[in-house]
Design a protein with these regions (language model features):
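N-terminal loops that bind phosphate or other acidic moieties
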Residues: 1-83
């Protein structure tokens, strides 16, 4: 069984976005792993494994418009099912 079940990916579109601040917030406030927060001041790509993807979405939506959201159940994928 995986420690963190959901592969959560999305884009944040906004103004004055800071990938370092976003990464720090994730590290301090969310349980998970495989964090990737890359981009520029107007667009950040997020990739994160967590058991609470709704918390990630809520935080990211507070920073700007979120889109291209993908949440995959990696446990199902590991069992040969659609995630």
């Amino acid at each position: 069984m995986l420690e963190f079940k959901y592969d959560t990916q999305l884009l944040i579109e906004g103004e004055n976005l800071d990938e370092d601040e976003i990464s720090e917030y994730f590290t301090e406030n969310f349980q998970g792993d495989c964090l990737l927060a890359v981009g520029d001041e107007e667009l950040i790509k997020i990739h994160f494994h967590t058991n609470a993807p709704w918390e990630v979405l809520e935080y990211c939506a507070s920073l700007g418009d979120i889109h291209d959201i993908v949440i995959e159940n990696m446990e199902r994928q590991a069992n040969g099912l659609q995630g």
